[in-house]
């Protein structure tokens, strides 16, 4: 009887292990909803972010254009701007910051663009992707991802995405860790027709500047 019970327990444990493994694999392979995504491949792991390209088109055009090298910058035409840069600033229980080619918080792409604040996008949960700046209208290439909700940043920094996978990686990032590569994923007709080149950036820049006047 004892052998039968032990065998039954082993079967149950094996079944649960296989089931849980299957659930984990299924969740990892779940298809993404239509949208525009950025996959940050870092030295600590991958971070998948959904970009708010409809609510903050200029900011997302800038980010995607720099990531893919389809937009002009001071790193050279056609260069994937973010690849190989570091997270130069990390404040525990606050945020991680990257996107500076100088590596010390003073650099950028060679230009600035206006804030693009959408009141429906807030720093209200962990994993918010937002633009770093040195005051109004000083956005460039630097961005940060939050560890926790940071409501005092609302209205001061442009929120343009949020983490949907890899918040544990965000929390594990330390100063000096590397952004190996940023891949942009387009799913659905709207995302596939979204352009992130210099002409698109210039047109959106002009529209936003006129709107603010």
Where are these regions (language model features)?
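Cyclophilin-like peptidyl-prolyl cis-trans isomerases
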Residues: 2-9, 15-213
